């Protein structure tokens, strides 16, 4: 993942970007 907002990632919902 590498977004700048909450999105549905392959691992689930990411609150913010990681890398």
Swiss-Prot record:
Protein keywords: Amidation, Neuropeptide, Secreted
One GO CC term on file: extracellular region
Residue numbers carrying Valine amide: 19
GO BP, sorted A to Z: neuropeptide signaling pathway
Compartment(s) where it occurs, according to its Swiss-Prot or TrEMBL record: Secreted
Keyword Secreted: yes
Transmembrane helix is among the record's keywords: no
Family named by the database record: Belongs to the periviscerokinin family.
Function: Mediates visceral muscle contractile activity (myotropic activity).
Name of the molecule in the record: CAPA-Periviscerokinin-2
Annotated source species: Mantophasma kudubergense
Lineage: Eukaryota, Metazoa, Ecdysozoa, Arthropoda, Hexapoda
